[in-house]
Design a protein with these regions (language model features):
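A structural signal for short, well-ordered beta-strand segments and their strand-loop junctions
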Residues: 91, 108-114, 152-156, 167, ...
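Conserved N-proximal alpha/beta basic substrate-recognition cap immediately N-terminal to
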Residues: 3-147, 159-160, 384, 388-454
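Short, surface-exposed charged micro-motifs
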Residues: 254-256, 320-324
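Phosphate-binding site of ATP-dependent enzymes
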Residues: 147-152, 157-158, 163-285
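Alpha-helix-centered segments that form part of catalytic cores
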Residues: 71, 76-78, 86, 216-239, ...
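C-terminal active-site "lid" helix and adjoining low-complexity regulatory extension at the edge
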Residues: 288-318, 325-417, 421-428, 432, ...
């Protein structure tokens, strides 16, 4: 309503004057509203005080703000620095691509066997090893490998908050069962996500949401065919991998790394996160690998591997590496190129790096009247695209299509206005009339520009 918009404008106006974008100010306003509604034991007065400095209320205890205000980078400034890095990071996060790119460190990556993708509405098993194909190249070969190994893991091809991994265990002749993947459950619990949200391992609760879709292929055990039917219901990409052999209680080591000027690698911060009962526990790790007075096993090898990976992908300026300790050493569980800050106070080295980066960005990002006018026109154009473009196409493709239409409308002088509108309505650019010889009778036999964009 009008009153809520007035409140929002009153809140974001001071932040706009400080040079933050409207998009960032609105995002911070949403976080502040959620923070005010959360009952975390912090008084409303302290919350408002922290918000005025650019921090959320959990940072008061985290950074001891009462005694050290302004020492650590604020939450709003960290949001201002995001997104980190550039287009070089597109491949990071995909397990299959990481397995191919980081070939010199494959012994510390998850061991993958098959990549499961969807083609023509069917799940297809492709070999990770496309050269020797020693584990096979189809679903039958996966079953053969499963019978040989006894158990394998089916996991999302990238870390997900909604999708989880399962252990597929052979329990008899042509009999397989889904089991809990300890590593995935620990990972998702640490980040506050629900494991087995599809309830494939447990009974459905009584308070299921109305829009919840029950999996029709759920069973207590599966044969070869029913297992394939179950896997076919999984959305997006999955991989078949070797289960982690976790040593003791699962924990997640996270190391913050930075590459300066494509040549110097710095490890900035280290911490360990695990579960203490149902509570998430986070502890700092020293640069020498000491945790609660004891040195972490394989620490020197961990540092060597992380430094080697960071140097190999030196185009990526700032990222974190998540590591799980196993019986045989360790495995690099994931790489995050847009990480959040640690849940505990971060190190001085990481803080100095972020503050220096913040100062450089403020020097280079200058909001001029021309930039403001360009942003205003882009916003108006996006609104026009949403209203005029047909649904069923991704927003960035809508923008490409409408940009093509606008360019054709302005520069193609060989067609009349009515011909242009006729073409646009049917998904063609107007110059196709002469190129294809378009008529009302034959235009459906050609692939339209709109369909090509889609």
């Amino acid at each position: 309503g009008v009153i809520s918009r007035i409140r929002r404008e009153a809140f974001i106006r001071p932040w706009l004057k400080k040079g933050y974008s409207r998009r960032l100010a609105n995002l911070y306003y949403k976080k502040v509203r959620a923070d005010l509604q959360e009952d975390n034991g912090v008084s409303a007065a302290d919350k408002k005080w922290a918000h005025s400095l650019g921090y959320l209320s959990d940072s008061i205890e985290k950074y001891d703000l009462k005694n050290t205000p302004g020492k650590y980078i604020s939450d709003v400034d960290y949001m201002y620095l995001k997104p980190f890095n550039n287009s070089f990071t597109k491949w990071v996060g995909d397990l299959v691509t990481e397995n191919r790119v980081l070939i010199n460190h494959r012994e510390h990556l998850p061991e993958l066997y098959f990549n499961i993708i969807e083609r023509e509405e069917k799940k297809v098993f492709l070999p990770i090893d496309t050269v020797d194909r020693k584990f096979g190249e189809n679903y039958d070969d996966f079953i053969r490998l499963l019978d040989e190994r006894g158990e394998l893991v089916i996991r999302p091809d990238r870390t997900s908050a909604n999708r989880c991994a399962y252990v597929i265990k052979r329990t008899g002749e042509d009999r397989y069962e889904l089991k809990e993947d300890t590593a995935c459950k620990a990972r998702m619990s640490i980040f506050g996500n629900q494991y087995d949200a599809a309830y494939l391992l447990s009974d459905y609760p009584d308070d299921l949401p109305e829009d919840f879709e029950k999996n029709p292929c759920k069973r207590e055990y599966y044969d070869k065919n029913s297992l394939y039917e179950l896997i076919s219901t999984f959305k997006y990409g999955y991989v078949i991998a070797e289960p982690y052999k976790i040593s003791g209680e699962p924990c997640l080591l996270r190391i913050y790394a930075a590459n300066e000027k494509l040549k110097e690698t710095k490890l900035l911060d280290y911490y360990c996160t695990d579960l203490d009962g149902e509570n998430v526990r986070c502890r700092a790790v020293t640069p020498s690998g000491e945790l609660d007075g004891r040195k972490i096993g394989c620490w020197d090898e961990i540092i060597k591997t992380v430094t080697g990976i960071a140097g190999y992908i030196s185009e990526i300026e700032y990222f974190t590496v998540s590591i799980m300790l196993t019986e045989g050493g360790f495995v690099i569980d994931s790489i995050d190129t847009n990480p959040d800050l640690p849940p505990i106070a971060h190190s001085d080295a990481l803080n100095s790096f972020l503050l220096d980066r913040l100062e450089k960005k403020r020097e280079t990002v200058v909001v001029t009247r021309e930039k403001w006018w360009t942003a205003f026109k882009d916003k108006r154009f996006k609104r026009f695209v949403r209203r005029c473009c047909r649904p069923g196409i991704r927003p960035y493709m809508q923008k490409l299509w409408m940009s093509s239409v606008w360019d054709d409308f302005r520069h193609n002088k060989g067609t009349t206005l009515s011909q242009k509108l006729w073409c646009y309505k049917r998904g063609f650019l107007s110059f196709r009339i002469k190129q294809y010889g378009l008529t009302k009778d034959n235009y459906k036999s050609f692939l339209s520009d709109y369909q090509y964009h889609w």
